[in-house]
From Swiss-Prot:
UniProt keywords, alphabetically: DNA-binding, Transcription, Transcription regulation
Protein's UniProt keywords contain Cytoplasm: no
Pfam families the UniProt entry points to: HTH_26
Keyword check for Transcription: yes
Record-annotated DNA-binding residue ranges: 36-55
GO molecular function terms noted in the UniProt entry: DNA binding
Originating species: Rickettsia prowazekii (strain Madrid E)
Superkingdom classification of source: Bacteria
Protein name: Uncharacterized HTH-type transcriptional regulator RP766
Domain HTH cro/C1-type: 25-83
Length: 92
């Protein structure tokens, strides 16, 4: 039972991550007025990977790699936390 629960939890986290990257890309592609093909070319991310990100809800098994998220962050001059919409708390 533990393995099953762990798998479900992992799947939910992966879906949430893929969905967050998708939402970030939808916003940025619109702002920058660029398309998926151009993004794939300038970031050296395979077009199929960009397409899979953009179909995040439909593709439940897809989880973008950290390297892919890093390339997206570098291109848009932001942090990986911004790409995945993770809130960073300062404890100062």
């Amino acid at each position: 039972m533990y393995i099953y629960k762990s798998f479900i939890y992992s799947e939910v986290i992966n879906m949430a991550l893929a969905t967050k990257v998708k939402e970030f890309l939808e916003e940025k592609l619109k702002q920058e007025k660029i398309d998926r093909k151009y993004l794939a070319q300038v970031t050296n991310i395979p077009y199929t990977t960009v397409s899979r990100i953009m179909r995040a809800e439909a593709n439940r098994e897809f989880n973008p790699e950290i390297d892919t998220i890093l390339k997206i962050a570098k291109y848009f001059n932001c942090t990986m936390d911004e790409v995945i919409k993770r809130k960073v708390h300062n404890n100062s």
